[in-house]
Amino acid sequence: MNNKTEMGSSTSGNCSSVSTTGLANSGSESDLRQRDLIDERKRKRKQSNRESARRSRMRKQKHLDDLTAQVTHLRKENAQIVAGIAVTTQHYVTIEAENDILRAQVLELNHRLQSLNEIVDFVESSSSGFGMETGQGLFDGGLFDGVMNPMNLGFYNQPIMASASTAGDVFNC
């Protein structure tokens, strides 16, 4: 019986050692499963991070491409504006030169008008001695319609004849 008891005890000892080993194995299997899960999560997280970084690089590249296209567009637009400014400046210079000419012509015409007004004033003040009625102007029955009318003056209708001998006589006096 002792043998049986020993056997029984050894059997029971074996069972307990098997169950202890089984518990130890199941604990290490559980740890392995947890480690595998943790490793799987790490691997998935790394993969997710790689994908996120790839998407981020793609967004960054797209943004860079958009900015490059915008720079190209703005440079073209700037070149067009500069060309437009050059054309407008040339038009301005041309118009300014024309305005300078017109201003000079206005001054000349104002001087001529002033001279003509002085002549008219002189003729009107001198015409009072010719027996003109008061209220008559130069052209409405006044001086030019009467005696001073170029059409009434005979020498305006005569041709001017000059020769070298008559010119010498006139200038040698």
From Swiss-Prot:
Region feature (Disordered): 1-65
Quaternary structure and interacting proteins, as annotated? Forms heterodimers with BZIP1, BZIP9, BZIP10, BZIP25 and BZIP63.
A biological process (GO) of this protein is: seed germination
Under PANTHER family, the record lists: BZIP TRANSCRIPTION FACTOR 44
User: Cross-referenced SUPFAM superfamilies, in alphabetical order?
Assistant: Leucine zipper domain (SSF57959)
Kindly list any coiled-coil regions of this protein.
Answer: none
Quote the biased-composition stretches of kind Basic and acidic residues, using this chain's numbering.
Answer: 30-41
Positions with biased composition (Low complexity): 8-22
Q: Does Ligase appear among the keywords?
A: no
Renumbered to this chain, region (Basic motif) spans: 41-62
Residue ranges of every copy of the bZIP domain listed in the record: 39-102
A Pfam family that this protein carries is: bZIP_1
One Gene Ontology term of the molecular function aspect = protein heterodimerization activity
Its localization reads: Nucleus
Q: What happens when the gene is disrupted?
A: No visible phenotype under normal growth conditions, but seeds have decreased germination speed after imbibition, without affecting overall germination rate.
According to the UniProt record, where is the region Leucine-zipper? 67-81
Keywords from UniProt, A to Z, are:
DNA-binding, Nucleus, Transcription, Transcription regulation
* Protein name listed in UniProt: bZIP transcription factor 44
Its biological purpose: Transcription factor that binds to the DNA G-box motif 5'-CACGTG-3' of MAN7 promoter. Involved in the positive regulation of seed germination through MAN7 gene activation. MAN7 is required for both, loosening of the micropylar endosperm, and rupture of the seed coat in germinating seeds.
- Provide the primary localization: nucleus
Instruction: List, alphabetically, the GO terms of the cellular component aspect.
Output: nucleus
Tissue specificity, per the record, is: Expressed in the micropylar endosperm and radicle tip in early germinating seeds.
